[in-house]
Design a protein with these regions (language model features):
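Flexible, glycine/charged-enriched surface loops at secondary-structure junctions
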Residues: 34-39, 58-61, 174-177, 252-255, ...
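Structural signal for hydrophobic packing residues in well-ordered secondary-structure cores
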Residues: 22-29, 33-36, 44-55, 64, ...
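Short, flexible turn/loop "capping" segments at secondary-structure junctions
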Residues: 21-23, 221-223, 252-256, 344-351, ...
Length: 478
């Protein structure tokens, strides 16, 4: 964007700013309307390479940590590269232009078309990875995307945009395919975007998600996390502890899929805690647990402190006044759950390297406690099970109302898809109607396609009444 354009937009009303950006996005879409599948896939590759290149990924991550104060550079760099690589693997070669499916016997042909200008509200926890991920999926459908960063994520998003534009120019595509709401960041402009785009995707605060759902714009907004892991009596405890440590500590638990609670069958509780300690955890006593709770939720009403979220463990220990030297050297903290619900905020999402543990008498109790935690916070999002009992793996799938359930995997790594499971790679995960979402799966490129279904006349071959009603009438009569 030219300095003149930036200056003009700074003096415009929010509705004028968003209207201009949408018009530019629509013109960019017109310019690629005739792109074939190969050209579209090249757009996706361009957006991916913009932040996958290692030096860029590290630079963007450093900006994100400096400006948001959340997470750490090494993990953010790894996340950008892993998620971008995985998403690109999912997208390349998949049909998204013109005829994408034809069923000759049924006379059905499906033709893919763009959804329009996509609005994406970007969270401060992933200010570099999320906009690129959304842009790749939107471009796969020949859409334009308009990004709305958080105040802390503005500089990161600007750098991401700079690199995406450079790559789009290399392939001769209009840079207005990917734009950003210009600074200063404001709710007025973000809300205007929510109201005016053709399709909306909000990943972030509960307030933004709720406002996006109330906009009336078709949306794929996603619910809050509060991932729970069950450790049953058959689990390999050392392997389980390593998985939970990975999930709990990665990027200082800024992910919505980071484990927040571990529900442990009583017969292995002490051994599981010991394994977690061996993996780097510090087990807090009652006094230390109270100190941590007061530090994480200083208002006493369950509101999470922004000063503590996404911080290194040593800083949390210092802020909470944990004087034990082992606490200052820990990778994460264990606190015993005393209850579930608003009066027990440690049972909710903490966005910090603090894991709440619950002892339960048996697997039935584990299922009951897990659902109770999710009913309080994180409905529909995710949970995990560490087990060697295949029967337990199937039972939990029927019993717990979540959209993704990982067996013997670190949730932070696996919920958003990986090469170790069959889930689509994404940074936006729907929680279904349980979480108040329209989306009940991992966001992918198919959500950014409109489809025209052409139905040709075929030779009729209807069933008989006997085919449809025979079994019912045999059982119940006429």
């Amino acid at each position: 964007m030219s300095p003149e354009s930036k200056g003009r937009q700074a003096s415009q009303e929010p509705d004028e700013v968003i209207e201009e950006l949408i018009e530019r996005g629509e013109r960019a879409m017109d310019a690629i309307a005739d792109y074939d599948q190969e050209q579209v896939d090249e757009l996706v590759q361009a957006a991916a390479w913009a932040i996958y290149e290692e030096e860029r990924a590290e630079e963007i991550s450093a900006i994100a940590v400096e400006t948001t104060g959340l997470g750490n550079v090494a993990d953010k760099t790894a996340k950008k590269r892993r998620k971008t690589f995985g998403t690109l693997s999912d997208l390349l070669g998949e049909p998204s232009v013109g005829v994408i499916d034809r069923e000759e016997a049924d006379g059905i042909t499906e033709i893919a078309k763009p959804v329009g200008v996509v609005g994406a509200v970007v969270p401060s926890t992933n200010p570099g990875a999320t906009p690129t991920n959304i842009a790749m999926m939107a471009l796969k459908g020949r859409n334009a995307v308009l990004l709305s960063p958080s105040p802390g994520g503005l500089e990161t998003c600007e750098k991401v945009l700079e690199y995406i534009h450079a790559e789009l120019e290399k392939v001769g595509a209009p840079t207005d395919l990917v734009q950003m709401v210009p600074p200063p960041v404001s709710k007025a402009k973000t809300y205007e975007l929510m109201d005016r785009v053709d399709l909306l995707q909000v990943t972030g605060s509960a307030n933004n998600v709720r406002r996006g759902e109330q906009s009336g714009t078709p949306n794929y907004n996603v619910g809050e996390g509060n991932a729970v892991s069950i450790i049953d009596e058959t689990a390999d405890l050392d392997a389980t502890a390593e998985r939970i440590e990975t999930s709990k500590t990665f990027d200082y638990a800024t992910s919505c899929s980071s484990d927040n609670s571990a529900v442990i069958v009583e017969s292995v509780y002490d051994d599981a805690i010991a394994a977690l300690e061996d993996a780097g955890a510090y087990r807090c006593d009652d006094e230390e647990r109270e100190k941590l709770e007061a530090t994480l939720f200083p208002d006493g009403a369950g509101s999470l402190s922004g000063e503590i979220t996404g911080q290194p463990p040593e800083e949390i220990a210092e802020a909470a006044g944990l004087e034990n030297a082992a606490a200052r050297e820990a990778d994460f903290f264990l606190v015993e759950g005393r209850g579930i619900g608003p009066d027990y905020p440690l049972s909710g999402e903490k966005i910090s390297v603090v894991l709440t543990t619950f002892a339960v008498p048996d697997f039935d109790g584990a299922l009951e406690t897990t659902q109770e935690i999710l009913d309080y916070e994180g409905s529909g999002h995710s949970c995990g099970l560490h087990t060697t009992d295949e029967g337990h793996a199937e039972r939990i799938g029927h019993a717990i109302d979540v959209c993704r359930l990982l067996i013997n995997q670190p949730q932070c790594v696996g919920n958003g898809g990986s090469f170790e499971n069959g889930l689509n790679v994404t940074l936006s995960m729907g929680a279904g109607t349980w979480g108040g979402n329209q989306l009940d799966e991992n966001l992918d490129y198919t959500h950014f396609l409109n489809t025209t279904t052409v139905a040709e006349a075929i030779e009729p071959d209807p069933p008989t009444e006997e085919d449809l009603f025979g079994s019912y009438l045999d059982e119940h009569g006429t």
